[in-house]
Structures are given as C-alpha cells and as structure tokens.
C-alpha cells in the first residue's frame, strides 16, 4: 500500500497529506485497518513530499520557499514502522533519480531502512525511466515496479483510428491526454504494425517489452475484464 504526498487534489486526506511521522503513522494504521491485516510487505511513498516534477510533468521548477519534509526525517519515520512490525520493506513511487539516490545515501549512512523498489510509469510510449533511473535500479538493486505498461490502455490498440470505446479511461476522462498526442498516436500505429508482422497482439508485444527489461522487478498489469486479464497474462 502507499502513503500519498502533498497536493491540492488530495487535501481532504489527513488535512493535507505529508510524509511526516504523524502523517505516516496515521496513514499506515488506517491502511492496516482497511486491509484487515497486521502488516504490509511493502509500504510506498506515492509521490515525493517536495517540489519536483512527476506524473508526466516536464521541467523542474525550484521553489526555495516550498514546504517539504526532510528525507532523513521521512526515513526515520519509516524505520519506526519497520521496527514496530507494521511494515516489512519500503519503496518509492513517481520518484526522480536525485530522490532515489538521496534516499539510498542517507539510509546507508544513518543505518536506516534501504529503499527496496520504485514504482514509476514505464512503457513503449514512456521510456523516461531509462534516462536516469534504469541504471540506478539495476546497479543499486532498487527494482522497478512498472505501472501503466499499456500507457493508459493506448498500447492495447483500442483507441486506434480515433476510437473511443464506451467505459474506457480516455473516453471517460479527457484529462488523461499524456499518451494521446499526435506523436504517441503515430508511434502506437507503428507498434501495432510491428506486432502484427510478428504474429503478436499489440498488448502482448507492449507487455513483453516491459517484462524483458533487466531492471524490472514487476510489471503491473491492469484489466477490467476477464478477456483483458487473459491477454495480459498470456
């Protein structure tokens, strides 16, 4: 499970969620109660508690006045959850190369829990992970839990030729336009032709690409029907 970071869109969580000890303690206790369990194997920070760019945002803007929780304080808070037995391992999500390396450096220097994984987007349409994070994941043993391997379903091919299937994500939510720009559409069309030439569905090829990466630990598939689930697993 995860603890979300700060953001106006989640201000109703805990009066404005942060990664302070008080917030993380409250968040894990609530998660354990909902899950009806005494512990979780992996506890992730959903996005950073500092001003940086994530969720597909390009460009970093520094704001020296922005509030943020120091990473050593975050790790100390997470250590208490590990010691208490509520959490077995910790992970990051939607993190940057600087963030991952800083978490690792402080943890090793101070004897605090070392990050085990990072859950970031990765697909044939989003390979930004390869720029600075792939080598870190591989050499530092911080396994990638790749989310959105089908790029919001675009790499299933269901949106080709302008189609908008009823109930599909991009049909319901126009704001998810990250993978529906002209460049992504042209790339998807080319990938579909390549998959067909090799006797594969676009979904099969897209998922196989992600799964074959040496820095991958888990490919997080998503399905809304048994048919989709079968194709994802096959």
Regions found by a protein language model. Name each.
Residues 33-56:
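Active-site groove signature of glycoside hydrolases
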